[in-house]
């Protein structure tokens, strides 16, 4: 076998093992002297090459892509039209409909079809992947591209199965789908957090998602409701199958403190983001809190309030 033929055979073998693009396969093999084992190790240590492979493998031929898009467009129109009918019943003077937007009424119909409650935590990662900017609204572009990214889920049955996978990815804080990582990295505003797990990204996303239109901060009522929804899914939360230690009782104390002591003040983005870190570090009796660390003052105030209000019999160290 000639040298060129041998390299071609190695290239085919390497691509079968890794699904690397031709460009990445040639580059990596050349860098490692066409030795399969070190080249394979290099591929799996090269995040961009893996992203390229994922995007390439999910690229459909034109006919198949057109068929997937047609099915997703039909589903989008079904829920958009259902939402438009619902909105007209509720508001005779409704604004002219946007043909590329599913509204709240349509989102509820979508939930019915998927057999999932809009109050189910899995609706948050779904909204994240479908790039919903606010509760109960989906654009045509976000809907189609999101479901394509989520295992080409172009039927209701496929989407139901995908939701169960998505739920587990959230609970396990699995890495984002590679195509979404590539999108995050291409945006300077999100590039630094592109390698965070799905739960962390969804927790961050929820702050803007739950905000009322035109508001910079999150209304306390909404913050409490969404903490109730999203925190029990956190890897930091104590539940079956989790190594987390933050408890429902601690969350209840936090909610009580905010309700009783802050006069209904809206929750800042800094408080929302850092509270997740707080749940990772605090112990059961709050005795290990570091007041010299750069926590938002409201978290320091919360710990002081707990120490004043939790009975000594509950194990609180008040020294």
Curated annotation (Swiss-Prot):
Keyword Aminoacyl-tRNA synthetase: no
GO CC annotation, single: ubiquitin ligase complex
Domain annotation DCUN1: ranges: 67-307
The entry's keywords: Ubl conjugation pathway
Described function: May contribute to neddylation of cullin components of SCF-type E3 ubiquitin ligase complexes. Neddylation of cullins play an essential role in the regulation of SCF-type complexes activity.
Residue ranges of every copy of the UBA-like domain listed in the record: 7-44
Record flagged with keyword S-adenosyl-L-methionine: no
SUPFAM superfamilies, per the entry: UBA-like (SSF46934)
Protein's recorded name: Defective in cullin neddylation protein 1
Upper lineage: Eukaryota, Fungi, Dikarya, Basidiomycota, Ustilaginomycotina
Biological process, per Gene Ontology: protein neddylation
Gene Ontology molecular functions: cullin family protein binding; ubiquitin conjugating enzyme binding; ubiquitin-like protein binding
Organism field: Mycosarcoma maydis
């Amino acid at each position: 076998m000639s040298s060129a033929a041998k390299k071609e055979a190695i290239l085919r073998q390497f691509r079968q093992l890794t699904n690397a693009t031709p460009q990445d396969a040639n580059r990596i093999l050349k860098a490692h002297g066409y030795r399969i084992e070190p080249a394979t190790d290099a591929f799996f240590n090269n995040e961009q090459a893996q992203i390229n492979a994922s995007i390439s493998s999910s690229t459909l031929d034109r006919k198949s892509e057109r068929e997937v898009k047609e099915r997703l467009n039909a589903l989008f129109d079904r829920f958009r039209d259902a939402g438009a009918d619902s909105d007209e019943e509720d508001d005779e003077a409704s604004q002219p409909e946007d043909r590329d937007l599913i509204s709240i009424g349509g989102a509820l119909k979508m939930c019915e079809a998927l057999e999932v409650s809009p109050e189910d935590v899995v609706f948050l990662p779904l909204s994240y992947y479908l790039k919903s900017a606010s509760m109960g609204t989906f654009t045509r572009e976000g809907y189609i591209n999101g479901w394509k990214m989520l295992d080409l889920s172009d039927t209701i049955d496929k989407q139901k199965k995908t939701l169960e996978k998505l739920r587990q990815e959230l609970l396990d804080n699995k890495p984002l789908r590679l195509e979404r990582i590539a999108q995050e990295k291409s945006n300077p505003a999100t590039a630094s957090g592109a390698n965070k797990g799905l739960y962390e990204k969804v927790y961050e996303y929820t702050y803007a998602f739950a905000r009322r239109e035109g508001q910079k901060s999150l209304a306390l009522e909404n913050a409490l409701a969404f903490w109730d929804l999203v925190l029990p899914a956190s890897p930091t939360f104590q539940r079956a199958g989790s190594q987390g230690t933050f408890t429902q009782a601690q969350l209840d104390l936090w909610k009580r403190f905010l309700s009783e002591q802050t006069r209904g003040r809206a929750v800042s983005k800094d408080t929302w983001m850092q509270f997740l870190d707080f749940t990772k570090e605090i112990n059961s009796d709050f005795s290990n809190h570091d007041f010299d660390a750069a926590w938002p003052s409201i978290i320091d105030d919360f710990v002081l309030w707990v120490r004043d209000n939790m009975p000594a019999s509950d194990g609180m160290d008040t020294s």
